[in-house]
Amino acid sequence: MSPVDRLREALPDAARDVRLNLQAVLQGGALTEGQRWGVAVASAAAARQPALLSAVLAEARSRGLDSAAEDGLAAAALMAMNNVYYRFRHMVGKPGYTEMPARLRMGRLAQPATSRADLELFSLAASAINGCEACVRTHEDVVVKGGIGEEAVHDAVRIAAVIHAAAVALEAGEVAGGHEAVSAA
């Protein structure tokens, strides 16, 4: 049984739909396997649920998708910073802040382990979870202009939504005391 399958089985009964959706979104669709698992890693890291991230990382690496996994982790880390900063600028809406340089290092965006378009796709998923409208719009535009179609973008956001829901369900199950902590091993 794969790490993600074990994790799915650990989801509480209240999250049956999430369990089924988690299986569905990680199969087939308009994304390549690397894109699918890079999005899953970025989403799991952005959702901040250790057992979920551990399972998704183990699954991606077991499939030989180390570059996608590394870019997924990089995207989540960068978006944790950028989404706060750019969401602030967008929410305040004052031209003065928009004109100030960010002065935040983002060199990894220029040096992906996969491709620029894939790293942007992973960043889009993390940004959707983090709720940065300006970031979502920017990443979606770059991804589509980079040759990844809207159907693939839609699949990526579906993965992000389900991964986020799985993180919430796992945490709720732990708090409710109905399930033991999940291990990816």
Curated annotation (Swiss-Prot):
It holds the Pfam family CMD. It is an enzyme of class 1 (oxidoreductase). Its EC number is 1.11.1.28. The active site is at 132 (proton donor), 135 (cysteine sulfenic acid (-soh) intermediate). Disulfide bonds join 132-135. InterPro entries: AhpD (IPR004674), AhpD-like (IPR029032), AhpD_core (IPR004675), CMD-like (IPR003779). One of its GO terms (molecular function) is alkyl hydroperoxide reductase activity. GO terms for biological process: cell redox homeostasis; response to oxidative stress. Antioxidant protein with alkyl hydroperoxidase activity. Required for the reduction of the AhpC active site cysteine residues and for the regeneration of the AhpC enzyme activity. This is Alkyl hydroperoxide reductase AhpD. The lineage of its organism: Bacteria, Pseudomonadati, Myxococcota, Myxococcia, Myxococcales.
